[in-house]
Amino acid sequence: MIKLTSLVKAAGUAAKLGPAGLEDALSGILGKGDDPNLLVGPETADDAGVYRIGEGLALVDTVDIITPLVDDPFTFGRIAAANALSDVYAMGGRPVTAMNLAFFPACTLPGQILADIMAGGLDAVREAGACLVGGHTVEDHELKYGLSVTGLISPGRIVRNSTARPGDRLILTKPLGTGIVSTAIKADMVAPGVVDEAIRWMALLNASAAGLMLECEASACTDVTGFGLLGHACEMARGAGVTLEIALDAVPLMGGVEDLVADGLVPAGCYRNRDHYTPLVSVSAGAGGRLIPLFDPQTSGGLLITLSPQFADSFLSMARDRGLFAVAVGGVLPPREHAVVIA
């Protein structure tokens, strides 16, 4: 089998621009604009855009492309598609159509690999109940694949990343560690069981967690992806004008992640996230390297959801009954000096 991860410089969402470079590039175009039908634009770094097309109906639009973070083509395609679909789920929407976006080194890889990647993507799209309607390819020296996704939503049901309220509780629906495990895969320094667990989480759609989020009237949500848990928590806090408190000991990690960090198998994107967001985070003495997984760029990560205490209890109970993963990791405070406080 061709080792896809050996063909790229960085894997998965760890290959994205760091937050500092992205903010600089976008600084001149941020702002929602004056179209009254544009309900969610780029102004709060939300997961997708939302555009009203009629009374009681709006489109949710997103795009996400990643480099290989596993070596099996079908699995890579499935994970990349799950990662792209997640943005629609995080907004409370329902995916309806998707388009392939493939950047492929046709001179060095057989075409069957691209076919297998797109088959994996189609598998996830079909599970989401959406239709694959086309796509676009580019011959490139480095392999990349993803989807543009369009969803539907009622304007009154949009769940934004900027509407957390003091007193809410904070819930996470997948453990952390995909960037660290992917770095170890690329280096051939990880046990198969650790890889298998990470793949299960990355291939899992956020559909069920998002459905439960809507049932429990979440106040805010984002999916944890390239900026890591702390980066996305900072964006939530800044957008809402609040402070998020995260209990370090409550944050779930995938199996083997702490050992991989101790071995130095940490993606460069993790350090970019740390450098950018650390000034916004208050850390108790002694946390040290324990924070590394919280800055780890996630691919197809879980939802980070805020709910009122009553609904948070219901969410956790219903998740348990339905066999869904969900952990309370903190809460929402009135604004303090820092966007995030690590307890």
From Swiss-Prot:
Against CDD domains, the record matches this protein to: SelD
Q: What Pfam families does the annotation carry?
A: AIRS, AIRS_C
- UniProt: ATP binding residues: 16, 44-46, 64, 87, 135-137
Q: Which GO molecular function terms does the record list?
A: ATP binding; magnesium ion binding; selenide, water dikinase activity
Q: Show the GO cellular component annotation of the record.
A: cytoplasm
Kindly state which keywords UniProt assigns to this record, in alphabetical order: ATP-binding, Kinase, Magnesium, Metal-binding, Nucleotide-binding, Selenium, Selenocysteine, Transferase
The record places the active site at 13
GO:BP terms for this protein?
selenocysteine biosynthetic process
Residues bound to Mg(2+):
47, 87, 223
**Top-level division of the source organism's lineage:** Bacteria
Q: How is the cofactor bound?
A: Binds 1 Mg(2+) ion per monomer.
Q: Which cofactor does it need?
A: Mg(2+)
Q: What class of enzyme is it?
A: transferase
Q: How does it assemble?
A: Homodimer.
Which NCBIfam families would you find in this protein's record? Answer: PRK00943.1, selD
Similarity comment text for this entry: Belongs to the selenophosphate synthase 1 family. Class I subfamily.
Q: What is this protein called?
A: Selenide, water dikinase
